Amino acid sequence: MENIQSGTLPAETAEQTEAASVAEVVEANDAPARRASLVDFLNSPAALLVAGAILIGAVFWYLQFSTGSLCCGDYDAYYHFRWSRMLWEGMRTGHFPPTFDALPLTTLNPKDYVDHHFLFHVLQIPFTFFSDFQTGAKIGTWLFACLAVFSCYWLLVRQRVSYPLVWLVAIVGSSAPFLYRMNMGKAMSLSIVLLVAGIHLFFERKYRWLLPLAFVFALAYDMFALLVAAAGLWTFVILWSERRLEWRPLVYVIAGSILGFVINPYFPHNFQLLYEHLVIKLTPNDFTTTVGSEWYPYTTWEFLGNCGVALAAMFVGYVSFNDSASEGRQRAFLLLLFSTLLMLANMRWRRF
């Protein structure tokens, strides 16, 4: 009582006050560090990949399940999924590959039939185990579409591109036909994953792995030619920037592609089918039997409307590109050349 009346504090109270003051100072000093730590975590590759996966999964889930049928009014997806089930049944019964007898009066008769999406159909088999085939097909299509876009996003994060989530939004929102085709239940989405894997191997210069990758690509989809083209462009980039011929990427990719055609249940008929595809689809106007609309060009205004965002990005890339000898510029040069090739292909054939 005497201490209170005299205006002094007990020793314990003074010590507590001093300790509290020290704690406040320490907390104030630690706050910026905690904020910096949180920012570092949010910008870490793991956090960026998780955020991107959630965004991609949500967008494609909404698109795929916004309709009761397989998106998007395309009948090919039903064929692909049903054939995957027939492959599984053939494996179980020892009749592999099974006989395809749905179109006996065409080049797809049982004798000449070739499954040029063979590995893609094998990868679809687990989704045929659903009691409701349509649900299984939609989930499988959703997963492959997600993997396609996520692989592109992963490459952005891997290469430490600034603001990868912004670029992801640009990828998802740049073209309605792109979203349309990713939701069609075809092998295109798988081909994007394999292409990104190939580009990553170019960048890391792990060329030997290109052989098994090309082998898998040739078994999965006949657009393996895109990987061959990318390998050729990378060889050119190295020749241009380093003044030396780096032959390994192109040789490994070509060798793997040939092996994928030879070590194939449909060999040698798959070579004949490849030739027929090249002839009829590269010159569709010379045949009375037309091919699918995806092999015809857009009109000019359709092309500009569908690819406006991508074309704007291409223009900015052309203007800002700096041709130097650095490794980063080599990578940028490859992507610039390859995207230009795809743009020109899309001008001629809308499927690209």
Q: Where do the language-model regions lie?
A:
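Transmembrane-helix motifs of polytopic, lipid-linked glycan transferases
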Residues: 139-160
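Juxtamembrane membrane-water interface segments that cap and precede transmembrane helices
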Residues: 101-105, 118-126, 272-305
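Membrane-interface alpha helices of multi-pass inner-membrane proteins
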Residues: 178, 196-201, 208-223, 227-228, ...
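Membrane-interface helix-loop-helix junctions at transmembrane boundaries of multi-pass membrane enzymes
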Residues: 241-251, 314-337
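Membrane-interface transmembrane helices that cradle and orient dolichyl/undecaprenyl
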Residues: 195-209, 310-328
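Start-transfer (signal-anchor) and selected internal transmembrane alpha helices
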Residues: 1-64
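Perimembrane helix-loop-helix junctions
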Residues: 227-255
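Membrane-interface coil-to-helix junctions
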Residues: 59, 63, 68-145, 176
